């Protein structure tokens, strides 16, 4: 009798081990990024820009947000040759353990201009479809044709730009991503900054508003040094 129960127990044990490995690998790959990452900007021509960072083209995006910036506006900015996108979120004491790339809401600035808010997104079927289509592209920009679906086709073709980025971690509250040009010259320069900042509400005597927001402890030194190296 014990010999007949031994095989099913082994099968159950193997199944549990396999499920544990799958679960751990899926959750681990979701939030892990190295010093070299794959960055993709994409969006429907009449829609908004999505920004994704992946460890490699086949891994789940560790960072995926939808910006309020229209795709057409970002295309015009990229044509200028130099684009800096800053994403800022508030530092909250009740979320001490949250990783920077897991923050859900960001204030967005593009070349110093306010561009609304960016929202963290889960990678759904539509996002995976785009990332899968551009998977073979190591660096470049282009347009994906419309699928003919009435729900998504109404926003036009999908425009994308894909490249390798160097990831620089300043602290647990600051990271920077610099687009890497294989030849070292030519093409647009794109830098993306993630900043988690402390926000204080105070009562000023010299303004009519009830309060204003003062930003503190923004770690700029790392990024200014890096930009100086790029310009030299």
Predicted features by range, described:
Residues 157-162, 189-190:
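Intrinsically disordered, low-complexity, charge-dense segments enriched in Lys/Arg
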Residues 70-72, 83-86, 120, 127-128, ...:
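Short, low-complexity, polar/charged sequence segments that are solvent-exposed and flexible
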Residues 57, 64-68, 76-81, 98-99, ...:
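Surface-exposed beta-strand edges and their flanking turn/coil or helix-capping segments
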Residues 1-68, 167-232:
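N-terminal low-complexity/intrinsically disordered pre-sequences and tails
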Residues 44-115:
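Short, well-structured hydrophobic secondary-structure segments
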Residues 106-109, 119, 161-163, 176-181, ...:
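Broad hydrophobic/π-residue packing in well-ordered secondary structure
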Residues 93-157:
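An exposed acidic His-Trp-rich patch
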């Amino acid at each position: 009798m014990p010999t007949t129960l031994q095989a099913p127990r082994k099968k159950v044990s193997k199944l549990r081990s396999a499920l544990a490995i799958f679960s751990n690998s899926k959750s681990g790959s979701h939030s892990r990024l190295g010093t070299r990452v794959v960055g993709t900007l994409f969006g429907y021509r009449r829609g908004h820009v999505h920004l994704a960072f992946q460890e490699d083209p086949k891994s789940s995006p560790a960072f995926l947000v939808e910006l309020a910036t229209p795709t057409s506006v970002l295309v015009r900015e990229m044509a200028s040759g130099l684009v800096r996108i800053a994403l800022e979120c508030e530092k909250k004491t009740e979320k001490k353990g949250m990783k920077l790339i897991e923050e859900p809401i960001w204030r967005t600035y593009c070349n110093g201009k306010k561009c609304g808010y960016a929202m963290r997104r889960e990678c759904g079927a539509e996002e995976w479809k785009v990332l899968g289509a551009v998977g073979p592209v190591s660096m470049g920009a282009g347009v994906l044709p419309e699928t003919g679906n009435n729900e998504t086709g109404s926003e036009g073709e999908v425009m994308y730009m894909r490249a390798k980025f160097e990831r620089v971690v300043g602290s647990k509250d600051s990271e920077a991503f610099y687009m890497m040009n294989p030849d070292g010259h030519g093409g647009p320069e794109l830098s993306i900054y993630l900043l988690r900042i402390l926000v204080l509400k105070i009562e000023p005597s010299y303004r009519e508003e009830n309060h204003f927001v003062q930003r503190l402890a923004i770690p700029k030194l790392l990024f200014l040094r890096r930009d100086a190296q790029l310009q030299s």
